[in-house]
Amino acid sequence: VRREALLAASACIYAIVLALIAFWPQHVDSAVPSRFWRMLETTIPFITYERVEFGANILLFVPLGILLALLLPARRWLAVPSAALVSAVIETVQGVFISGRTASILDVVANVIGASIGLAIVAIAYRARRRRA
């Protein structure tokens, strides 16, 4: 019971944070000055704004993949399609209803990669746990 309560609480907290980030009226990184990005790209050419944004979108959905895999152990495979659906809904809402945000299919791709990583983490952990038992 304690494990389920902890997972449910974690899922609720994650959902709130995800909603705040996804539905914030402006890009959440709008406070970062553009001169910072120019300096960073000049200093380390590999690190571009687009790559950082793509990586952030991956990281944003790793917890969703983990949580869905743990909450639905018998249907773990649903984690990735569910994450794709959540991401598509977020991008649609951003594109249609939030004028300060931009919808992007690349965000959906990154989010699905993140959820897949989360699912893989759980699968590897379960496999390692079974080997020890």
What positions do the PLM features span?
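Bulky hydrophobic segments
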Residues: 1-101, 105, 119-133
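Individual transmembrane alpha-helices with interfacial aromatic-anchor signatures
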Residues: 104-109, 113
